[in-house]
């Protein structure tokens, strides 16, 4: 079974999970290829929900294409659930997220939700976070000072570069990747994150950091994880 099949399988399982919610709720929706599978699976049932709150411009575009109502987060007080993928997840439900660059908005929407439903395949499960590079969104003018502070953690820090042209942000390959918020991303490789809550707090206190892609405070409550045998539901 390939990665695309595993993503579709867990997307279908997430659809079934959120359809247990009472009708008329507002749903938080994440960003990335696995979240896209969830959106596509949920599309025939869009009328079950009063609306959605999106974590990125790309997700908003996909939701609108399917006919979902997308609401401004400032107009929503709370959400019953937020559904999103992860780049890594440990046994406690702490995650590394932000491989797609939407970490700040993802964390904002996750903080509004009563439960975080993480969807991924079993390759994302790790005993200790850090094999996947940890993203940190920053204000561009703070690149130097933040890099120096992050290097004290012991990993290798690199500036994320754009992979493709993005005209709306004047972004071309080999130039810094620009987030939906206009920030840059520093990726830290080679960390072993034994205390995610501590590292999350430490990095977030560095001047110039918008947020770090550690989801320790806003950890997953339910994990839907796909493998060759099916989808496991784990309460964290």
Swiss-Prot record:
The keyword Protein biosynthesis does not apply. GO terms for molecular function: ribose-5-phosphate isomerase activity. The keyword Lyase does not apply. Belongs to the ribose 5-phosphate isomerase family. Catalyzes the reversible conversion of ribose-5-phosphate to ribulose 5-phosphate. Substrate binds at residues 31-34, 84-87, 97-100, 124. Pfam families: Rib_5-P_isom_A. Signal peptide: none annotated. The gene is rpiA. The active site is at 106 (proton acceptor). Keywords: Isomerase. This is Ribose-5-phosphate isomerase A. It comes from Polynucleobacter asymbioticus (strain DSM 18221 / CIP 109841 / QLW-P1DMWA-1) (Polynucleobacter necessarius subsp. asymbioticus). CDD domains: RPI_A (cd01398). Pathway: Carbohydrate degradation; pentose phosphate pathway; D-ribose 5-phosphate from D-ribulose 5-phosphate (non-oxidative stage): step 1/1. HAMAP family: Rib_5P_isom_A.
């Amino acid at each position: 079974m390939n990665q695309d099949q595993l993503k579709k399988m867990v997307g279908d399982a997430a659809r079934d999970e959120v359809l247990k919610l009472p009708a008329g709720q507002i749903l938080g929706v994440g960003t990335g290829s696995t979240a896209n599978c969830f959106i596509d699976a949920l599309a025939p049932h869009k009328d079950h929900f009063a609306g959605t709150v999106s974590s990125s411009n790309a997700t908003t575009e996909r939701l609108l294409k399917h006919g979902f109502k997308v609401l401004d987060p400032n107009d929503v007080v709370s959400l019953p659930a937020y559904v999103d993928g992860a780049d890594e997840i440990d046994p406690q439900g702490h995650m590394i997220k932000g491989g797609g660059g939407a970490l700040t908005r993802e964390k904002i929407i996750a903080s509004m939700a009563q439960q975080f439903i993480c969807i991924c395949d079993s390759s994302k499960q790790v005993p200790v976070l850090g094999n996947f590079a940890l993203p940190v969104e920053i204000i561009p003018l703070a690149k130097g000072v933040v890099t120096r502070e992050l290097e004290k953690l012991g990993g290798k820090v690199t500036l994320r570069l754009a992979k493709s042209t993005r005209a709306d942000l004047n972004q071309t390959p080999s130039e810094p990747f620009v987030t939906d918020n206009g920030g840059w991303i520093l990726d830290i490789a080679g960390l072993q994150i034994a205390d995610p809550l501590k590292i999350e707090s430490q990095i977030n206190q560095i001047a110039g950091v918008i947020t770090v892609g550690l989801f320790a405070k806003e950890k997953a409550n339910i994990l839907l994880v796909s493998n060759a045998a099916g989808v496991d539901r784990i309460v964290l």
